[in-house]
Amino acid sequence: AARNNDIDFNQVLANGALPMVATFADNFSKMVVTSNADWDEAHPAGTSLDDVLQVRINSSSDFVHDGYDMGEYKYEFLQNYDYLKTIEKRPSELTAADMKMVYYSLTDFSSQTKSPVIVFTSAPTLEKEHTLTLRWTTVEGDVKTASVTCTPEVDPALQ
């Protein structure tokens, strides 16, 4: 919290009716997503999938740096996630400012989750099952890695 100057809110957020407000402890400067399998002819295993996906993240950075301004409807402001700024970009387009104070939830697995989400803009044509690896580089230069095995699909609304 101190690294982002998030030290002055000092208010009760909820009585259990609101989701827990949490952000990653790290701020990030770079994101790369790769697969262990060939995606298509242009994306062999191990290469960046930057041009076949977008990332949706939510940040509370603006809310904190603007002095925690919630207006007069504080409960609704928090309940509706109005304190979060939504960013949707290709990984290579994300800036360090975009990836500062990234929100996450350990309990929200809905399609409307505010946690980071990868959205595919094209489906793989060679291999169907992929182990995707996300590498997030912190502003200090440390690399955080997570992998998941899945069968990527494109949301029909994007086609």
What are these regions (language model features)?
Residues A1-Q159:
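Non-catalytic macromolecular-recognition regions in eukaryotic signaling proteins
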